[in-house]
């Protein structure tokens, strides 16, 4: 029985997906199509978005890059246009500052409304010298309503899984209620959209097709990691995709000795240490 392997490869992480029809180790079975509820479809699409954002983070950001929350002064209320105008100006100022240093500015952001109706913005971006001072200056110049900001460094534990989940989280009913007071009704949906800079690496899977062996061996012995990587045991997931009937195996590998942004930008990407080679037994 043929199956497909899809590998999403980043410098410090590799995500592997195996898909095939039927039971593991046996000829495929045809399954009846099931009608799915709107809630099931919504949850499935949300998980797919989390995967997409997680892979974007893995492909473009490193441990010790920044996760920043920009806040407005207490009591500030703005519609979506006001949000976007302030944020666009902030990003433009930051981009210019990075450009003067000869550094490409990359980012992922999401505008959010707090439970008390306070607007704020979550942004992930690459680190460079003097970033904290840049943020303070750029935010004050971008908006007369600029308040405080919080800055944290990224932790690549679990392949940025928790970070991606937070960036993509759905608003609860309390927050949805606040939107009626904080924003124009027709603009609500835009608030929770994840946006990115155009210069991000967009990871595409490396696909492999196999017809000479089944998943029985890999299930019995367990998957084998790429040299220099370890398999995150908690990441191994098997099951059946309810939307296409394909049985799947998914897991993540993480580099044992992670490569830093400095190592990568100083030419590591052109050296063997940044390349991944893995043997597959047939």
Regions flagged by a language model, labelled:
Residues 1-117, 127-282:
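Right-hand nucleic-acid polymerase module
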């Amino acid at each position: 029985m043929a199956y497909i392997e899809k590998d999403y490869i980043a410098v410090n992480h590799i995500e592997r997906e195996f898909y095939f029809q039927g039971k593991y180790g046996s000829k495929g079975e045809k399954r009846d199509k099931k009608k799915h509820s709107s809630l099931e479809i919504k949850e499935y699409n949300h998980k797919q978005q989390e995967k997409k954002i997680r892979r974007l983070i893995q492909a473009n950001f490193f441990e010790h890059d920044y996760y920043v929350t920009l806040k407005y002064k207490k009591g500030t209320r703005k519609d979506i246009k006001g949000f976007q105008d302030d944020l666009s100006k902030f990003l433009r100022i930051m981009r210019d500052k990075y450009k003067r240093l000869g550094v490409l500015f990359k980012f992922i952001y999401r505008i959010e409304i707090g439970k008390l109706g306070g607007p704020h913005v979550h942004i992930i971006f690459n680190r460079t010298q003097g970033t904290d001072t840049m943020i303070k200056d750029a935010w004050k110049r971008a908006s007369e309503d600029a308040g405080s900001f919080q800055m944290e460094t990224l932790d690549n534990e679990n392949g940025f899984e928790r970070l991606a989940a937070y960036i993509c989280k759905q608003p609860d009913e309390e927050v949805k209620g606040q939107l009626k007071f904080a924003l124009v009704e027709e603009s609500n949906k835009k608030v929770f959209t994840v946006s990115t800079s155009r210069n991000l690496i967009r990871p595409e899977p490396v696909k492999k097709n196999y017809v000479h062996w089944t998943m029985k061996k890999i299930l019995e012995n367990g998957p084998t990691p790429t040299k220099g990587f370890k398999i995150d045991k908690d990441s191994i997931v098997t099951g059946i995709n309810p939307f296409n009937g394909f049985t799947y195996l998914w897991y993540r590998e993480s580099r044992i000795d992670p490569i830093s942004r400095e190592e990568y930008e100083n030419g590591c990407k052109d050296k063997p240490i940044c390349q991944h080679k893995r043997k597959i037994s047939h």
